[in-house]
Amino acid sequence: MDGVFPGISTGTRWYDWYNQTAVSASAYTNTTIEAPLGHIPVYIRGGSVLPQQEPLLTTAACRNSSWSLIAALDIEGSATGTLYVDDGESLMQEKTLLVDFTVAGRALYASGRGLYADTNTLANVTVLGVGSVPGNVTLNGAAVPGSAVTYDGTGQVLKVVGLQNMTQAGAWAQDWVLRW
């Protein structure tokens, strides 16, 4: 199948959802996209932060799982995103939570506002497009163990896993910054 990736001519970066590497495409040109049976091609536009929870059998079960983030950097090394959280059941929401994400200068910032208390922890953060080896990784100034950090220099992917113990009160219980 052929497709065009918008914005390539102006420096927009796209990442393959599955292998998390930057797409090699030319501006204004059809790019062949592999789409065998059973595979849906999905791409992430650089400059986006995507919150995730594990897909489970029910909404209620999913609501009780840890959070993960994928930050896909643009060519300037930045990204933004927003997460809206409520109880998932009420028709009229009395308490909600809005979390803003910003990546700038080798740091991911999360800032929440609202009255809804989401107690699910943050498990993992994946940053796509990290062009150089990260330094010490910290969450709110506390060192993340080296065993929890991996960097793929070829794919330019930074993965930070096992953050549950550092976010036991809930991923969005307080504002935080992850630096690398």
Where are these regions (language model features)?
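Catalytic core of carbohydrate-active enzymes
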Residues: M1-P134
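C-terminal accessory domains/tails appended to large, multi-domain proteins
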Residues: V125-V133, A143-V144, L163, W172-A173, ...
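Extracellular/luminal ectodomains and secreted, surface-exposed scaffolds of diverse proteins
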Residues: N140-A171
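Short beta-strand element of the conserved SAM-dependent methyltransferase core
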Residues: Y43-R45, F101, V149, G170, ...
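Solvent-exposed, conformationally flexible loop/turn segments
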Residues: A25-N30, M166-A173
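A generic structural signal for beta-strand entry/edge sites
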Residues: G105-Y109, L122, G153-L158, D175
